Regions:
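Coiled-coil dimerization/phosphotransfer module
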Residues: 1-123
Length: 123
């Protein structure tokens, strides 16, 4: 069982909500620091979905194609607030910092049908 799979299972049990991990093909992250930062980004995004978004259905997805790795965390909560850039919270800043540290990009978007999706892309 991968660390992300174990984490989503623990979140599901602890909070009584749907938190799933999907990974169609095994993804090899050969640098421990990169794997740690990806894990922590997922952890922060899931925490935000529960704490701020009220998400009851969270999907953590990891994929790799052509040497690129993508980690996405999607929830069905209230969505990203309009004033998120002015937020005093550190969570988004820390996720951005972690992504930049490993040479990745981080995108946080409000979904048209509600909820938020956080995507970390690493080339």
């Amino acid at each position: 069982m991968s660390a992300l799979e174990q984490y989503t299972s623990e979140v599901q049990d602890l909070f009584g909500l749907s938190c799933r991990f999907e990974c169609d093909m095994p993804v090899l992250v050969d640098q421990e620091a990169v794997a740690n930062h990806l894990y922590r980004i997922a952890q922060e995004a899931v925490n935000n979905a529960i704490k701020h978004g009220g998400g009851r259905d969270i999907l953590v997805k990891l994929s790799a194609e052509g040497g690129n790795i993508a980690l996405s965390i999607r929830d069905n909560g209230v969505g990203l607030p309009e004033n998120v850039r002015a937020s005093k919270g550190m969570g988004l800043h820390i996720m951005n910092y972690r992504a930049k540290t490993i040479g990745a990009t981080l995108q946080v978007q409000r979904c048209p049908d509600g909820g938020t999706v956080v995507t970390c892309s690493l080339q």
